[in-house]
């Protein structure tokens, strides 16, 4: 389980990609209220699934054993359901290969969305914009 406040190796990349998605929504969605643009930004495709291969392997292996993952937020559950679906398909096309290979391939493939809440996106985007204004881009 992820520890509160832990930061993944790819968090800065995810945040930059989310900000770019938001800026694209701003540029192309005339007449849409700002509060709705965060939701539009997170529903756009992402370059990968924003979860570590290790954590995804833990959850997918549990799902393959028949364990449920009902204790997760809806967006996170939807992400793991999509990863699971793709892992099952990948294994069907690549019999005999380990689950870890399937998870690695899937997690590093394009994702249909960011799997974040609108509120999370808003917090991330405003934080990045604040850092950009102050010149504090350490992330």
Task: Describe the residue ranges of each PLM region.
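Short coil/turn residues that cap or connect secondary-structure elements
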Residues: 29, 94-95, 110
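Sequence-specific DNA-binding recognition helix
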Residues: 100-104, 108
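Basic, amphipathic alpha-helix used for nucleic-acid engagement in HTH/winged-helix/SANT-Myb modules
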Residues: 1-28, 34-92, 136-139
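Short, basic interhelical loop/turn and adjoining N-cap
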Residues: 42-61, 107-127
